[in-house]
Amino acid sequence: MNDKEMSIEEQIKAFETAANAAATAVPKESILGKTAAEILEMVSSYASDAQVFYRKGDLVNAFAAAAYGLGWLDCGGYLGYMNTGISGCPALESAFPAELMEKLEEKTYRYQRMLTGALKAVSKAPDKETVAAAAASEIFGTVTSGLTDGDTFLPKDMVNALCIFSYWYGWLDCGVRAGLFVITGDRHLFTI
């Protein structure tokens, strides 16, 4: 998690800027290019969703969508599919409108359960002697640590807990799409 806190509005704008600047880093006609295009499509879709939710006043879904999309973008950069570096999970100001707290709490605990289930529903796909296996291990370990980090914010800071759960869920989902993990459990937990 980044040290500097930002507002939800700043987080959404920063993600939108990063998403608009993103491009694939591999030849489009290649197998890797097809996966890169899928990653970029997910990033673009979630940047658009975040803006739509924000304009409608749905701050909960707006910042969760931006965090999830940023997870996809950062994982895509880490894996070499995208031309980006890794931004990291943003730290958000924890102040939140009282009238949205019930929705925030419900979504935060739902994403905690979903990420927990998603981690249990995958296994590493690549052979253990490959670089891809090392990447899968790194992603799995980092996402697991992210889940633990998010748990430490509960129940006092639902904003940052949801941001963390959403961000690391994006990483795991991107790893599945990139072929680093095979789904052994509930496929509905992934966008595959």
Features from the language model and the residues they span:
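Long, charged/polar, soluble alpha-helical segments
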Residues: M1-I192
